[in-house]
């Protein structure tokens, strides 16, 4: 019985000591203690309907604000009008184009020479039209295709000026101490085209 009463007394003493240690003392102790309790209660309680900002509640990237459709339509009409005026007056400088021909993309302008790594079924002097035009640009504007520009909008013409063969390549195979040696000379046909003209329609729309 004495041991149990001693244990209870020691427990109460330890609890009182811990409360006295944790609770601040002094002239401003009451206000400091109330302020700390109020801060803890505010930090752990949220307003009704509040959702913390996390990667699940909102994406980590910044929000993209789309332009007003009416304003975008008006701006598009102004740009098309300016481009049409430059095309009509011819104040757009030298044109360049990106065309897809012979399984490759070529950036060309007038009087350029391009070397095709295969033989075309055309004679020298024949004129052809490059129909797959991906892009046409000038000093102040650029027309992009999705993926190609219309045939009635852009016209790129070229002329076959030369049909020749590539420089010979020597392929040599040799096995030492086997008396094996094999030599092969490889040449590939080539075609040279000259870009004659790049023309665009006088009106985009």
UniProtKB/Swiss-Prot annotation:
One of its GO terms (biological process) is mitochondrial translation. Coiled coil: none annotated. Residues 1-39 form a transit peptide. Keywords: Mitochondrion, Ribonucleoprotein, Ribosomal protein, Transit peptide. GO terms for molecular function: RNA binding; structural constituent of ribosome. The keyword Disulfide bond does not apply. GO terms for cellular component: mitochondrial inner membrane; mitochondrial large ribosomal subunit; mitochondrion. It is found in: Mitochondrion. NCBIfam families: L21. PANTHER family: 50S RIBOSOMAL PROTEIN L21, LARGE RIBOSOMAL SUBUNIT PROTEIN BL21M. Component of the mitochondrial large ribosomal subunit (mt-LSU). Mature mammalian 55S mitochondrial ribosomes consist of a small (28S) and a large (39S) subunit. The 28S small subunit contains a 12S ribosomal RNA (12S mt-rRNA) and 30 different proteins. The 39S large subunit contains a 16S rRNA (16S mt-rRNA), a copy of mitochondrial valine transfer RNA (mt-tRNA(Val)), which plays an integral structural role, and 52 different proteins. Belongs to the bacterial ribosomal protein bL21 family. This is Large ribosomal subunit protein bL21m. It comes from Homo sapiens (Human). The gene is MRPL21.
């Amino acid at each position: 019985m004495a041991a149990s009463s001693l244990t209870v007394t020691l427990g109460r003493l330890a609890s009182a000591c811990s409360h006295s240690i944790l609770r601040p003392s002094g002239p401003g102790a009451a206000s400091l203690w109330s302020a700390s309790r109020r801060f803890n209660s505010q930090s752990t309680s949220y307003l009704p309907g509040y959702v913390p900002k996390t990667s699940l509640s909102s994406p980590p990237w910044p929000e993209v604000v789309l332009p007003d459709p009416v304003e975008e339509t008006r701006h598009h009409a102004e740009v098309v009008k300016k481009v049409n005026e430059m095309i009509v007056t011819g104040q757009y400088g030298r044109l360049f184009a990106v065309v897809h021909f012979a399984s490759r993309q070529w950036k060309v302008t007038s009087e350029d020479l391009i070397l095709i790594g295969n033989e075309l079924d055309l004679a020298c002097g024949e004129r052809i039209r490059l129909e797959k035009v991906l892009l046409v640009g000038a000093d102040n504007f650029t027309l992009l295709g999705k993926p190609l520009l219309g045939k009635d909008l852009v016209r790129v013409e070229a002329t076959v000026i030369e049909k020749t063969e590539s420089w010979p390549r020597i392929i040599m195979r040799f096995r030492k101490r086997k008396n094996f040696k094999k030599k092969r000379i490889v040449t590939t046909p080539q075609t040279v085209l000259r870009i004659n003209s790049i023309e665009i329609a006088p009106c985009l729309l």
